[in-house]
C-alpha cells in the first residue's frame, strides 16, 4: 500500500547557462593581441583596423594597442565599428 500520494510531474524546471555576451574591452582601454573585445550574435559591432572577426562573430585584437569605437553610416544606417590603435614601440 502506498504511503505517499503520487507527486505531480512537470515539464518545467530547466534553465540554460548565460552566454556572457557583450563588450569586454571599452574605448580607451589597452589590449594585447588576441584579447576579446566584443562577444555578440551577428555583427552589432563591425571590425575595423587591427580587429579580427571570429566564426561566432567575436571581435578580437590583432595587435597590442588601445581600443576605440566609432559610429559610421552605411546605407542610411548608423553602425558601430571598433579599431585597435597600435601601441607606439
From Swiss-Prot:
Keyword terms, alphabetized: Ribonucleoprotein, Ribosomal protein
Q: Which GO terms describe its molecular function?
A: structural constituent of ribosome
Q: Does the keyword Plastid apply?
A: no
Listed Gene3D superfamilies: 2.40.50.100
Q: Spell out where the chain crosses the membrane.
A: none
| Region annotation Disordered: where it falls in the sequence | 1-26
Query: Could you list the residue ranges forming a coiled coil in this record?
Result: none
Q: Which biological process, per GO, is one annotated for this protein?
A: translation
Identify the Pfam families for this entry.
Ribosomal_L27
The superkingdom listed in its UniProt entry is Bacteria
- GO CC annotation terms, alphabetical: cytosolic large ribosomal subunit
Q: Does the keyword Metal-binding apply?
A: no
The UniProt entry's sequence similarity note says: Belongs to the bacterial ribosomal protein bL27 family.
| Protein name (record) | Large ribosomal subunit protein bL27
Q: Which organism is it from?
A: Oleidesulfovibrio alaskensis (strain ATCC BAA-1058 / DSM 17464 / G20)
Q: Report which gene this protein is encoded by.
A: rpmA
